[in-house]
Amino acid sequence: MKLKTLTLTHYRNYETAELNFSDEVNIFIGINAQGKTNLLEAIYCLAMAKSHRTSNDKELIGWGHEFSHIEGMLSYKHGTMPLSLSISKKGKKAKVNYLEQKRLTEYIGHMNVVLFAPEDLNLVKGSPQIRRRFIDMEIGQISAVYLNDLSNYQRLLKQKNHLLKQMKLSNSNDMTMLEVINEQFAQYAVKLTLRRKMFIEQLETLAIPIHTGITKDKERLSLRYNASLNYELAEQEMFEETIRILNANMGKEIERTQSLYGPHRDDLSFKINDIDVQTYGSQGQQRTTALSIKLAEIELINQEIGEYPILLLDDVLSELDDDRQTHLLTTIQHKVQTFVTTTSVEGIEHETINKAKLFNVSEGQISTN
């Protein structure tokens, strides 16, 4: 898939902007704090209906305005599709083919993106919450069912935690309501855990040869989904085991006033040659691991939906050494539409620059060469 055009209205520091893109590489050039990353963020928002930089949607609305609007024309193998996202203080409205979607979960997945930014090193060395968010966002792009299950799970998790606090405050011994919530909670916990397990296995299969290529066969990468539930069981057995664990630990959860078991407690670990990369890996190994995961993600989305996603590279090409940059650019060449932000084209392969469409960004104004 390719993003042919992007139109912004009152988006961050852009009063208005209309851009036409190359199907190959598009590079936004400018000094810091001019709005380069805002453009990548707008593309990400158009795909995911949320920012990767802030959870406060009000920040996306230009100063002094009541709303912001992002619009894009997407092309696929079989045609084109207009997408739009309007953001106001009242909420968000998303349209596909000019038709408003009832839920954002119905909108997400029409446009697929993979973002690689300097902070993605935190995917390897950061908190488990970062890795869970990564898993949820990436599966959500290719599975509307997963997004729906995740939404239901998060709703039940919130209800359960609220009930646990009430039970501790009232010193209640009546477990009836908690048992009812646990049964519903377990159903979605099992669904999410099994889907995540499958995703991690698929990702590992694709990431291993990529990582081996980057490291010139010196290192072997492995991924493991560390779940609080036993995913080696059949689905029905797993559900029954989960119910047993939840009900056996009700007293403990009431005392702690939080849900101690379920996908919201899970993590993803990375090993190189059987050594934990998060704890013992060098920065170079952590960066290579993150790059391998991102490139594997591109291939996984293509396998699942039959289209390559759009790649967003936020100030990372200059941070990659020659070998990693070459591997990245070779992998995506002629297959993946790519958007790059950089303060300078120095350090980027000449071949890439020569075939790219360049956009100069300064104080919210954009010009092309």
From Swiss-Prot:
Binding site for ATP: G30, I31, N32, A33, Q34, G35, K36, T37
GO biological process: DNA replication; DNA synthesis involved in DNA repair; double-strand break repair; SOS response
One GO cellular component, as annotated: cytoplasm
Pfam families noted in UniProt: SMC_N
Location of this chain's protein in the cell: Cytoplasm
Main function: The RecF protein is involved in DNA metabolism; it is required for DNA replication and normal SOS inducibility. RecF binds preferentially to single-stranded, linear DNA. It also seems to bind ATP.
InterPro entries in the record: DNA-binding_RecF, DNA-binding_RecF_CS, P-loop_NTPase, RecF/RecN/SMC_N, RecF_2
Similarity section: Belongs to the RecF family.
Organism from which the protein derives: Macrococcus caseolyticus (strain JCSC5402)
Keyword terms: ATP-binding, Cytoplasm, DNA damage, DNA repair, DNA replication, DNA-binding, Nucleotide-binding, SOS response
Protein's name according to its UniProt entry: DNA replication and repair protein RecF
The keyword Metal-binding belongs to this UniProt entry's keyword annotation: no
Record carries keyword NADP: no
Primary localization class, coarse: cytoplasm
Gene Ontology MF terms in the entry: ATP binding; single-stranded DNA binding
